[in-house]
Amino acid sequence: MPTIKCVVVGDGAVGKTCLLISYTTNKFPSDYVPTVFDNYAVTVMIGDEPYTLGLFDTAGQEDYDRLRPLSYPQTDVFLVCFSVTSPASFENVKEKWFPEVHHHCPGVPCLIVGTQIDLRDDPSVQQKLARQHQHPLTHEQGERLARELGAVKYVECSALTQKGLKNVFDEAIVAALDPPVPHKKKSKCLVL
């Protein structure tokens, strides 16, 4: 059975593990335990053909910056995650995560994933962010970032409610099986 390797990266506590556990077990985990490295496998049908979707969870904490890339070889698609309630994690997609995966795996398709969308309209979250002169990130901001970085696309979900969750992995599978062709600048011949 063919395998698709999907690696999930992003800051600590943005919901990477919850995303994977909720998708693979249909249950939302109740406790937060920082991940060092974990993997999960599910069988998915694509047309009439079964595939193994290998899901690799990684640690977002800086302590693991040297260890994390060991999970990158042979990756078919990356999910680069941020929480829509954490502007710092959104900035780190551009400053840290996208450059890191492109350094180690140039040309591998990446999706930008906004997590915890169930908290976007939560009054206590909005108040906490407002005290810091911030607000939850919008879908449009995610799409703009994906375009700016050259990601395959922007998707968002809630591991708690499962809204958009299956779509994240459906889009990852599509990107892995049919990676976009990188746009090469057309070279022009100039005769002077």
From Swiss-Prot:
Positions of post-translational Cysteine methyl ester modification: C189
Residues given in the record as GTP binding sites: 10-17, 57-61, 115-118
Membrane topology summary: Lipid-anchor
Taxonomic superkingdom: Eukaryota
GO biological process entries: actin filament organization; bipolar cell growth; cell division; endocytosis; establishment of cell polarity; mitotic nuclear membrane biogenesis; positive regulation of mating projection assembly; regulation of beta-glucan biosynthetic process
SMART domains per the UniProt record, alphabetical: RAB, RAS, RHO
Lipid anchor positions (S-geranylgeranyl cysteine): C189
One cellular component (GO) term of this entry: endomembrane system
SUPFAM superfamilies named in the record: P-loop containing nucleoside triphosphate hydrolases
Keyword Cell division applies: yes
Sequence motif Effector region, residues: 32-40
Keyword Ligase: no
The protein's role, per its UniProt record: Involved in development of cell polarity during the cell division cycle.
PANTHER family according to UniProt: RHO FAMILY GTPASE (PTHR24072)
Listed name of the protein: Cell division control protein 42 homolog
Gene giving rise to this polypeptide: cdc42
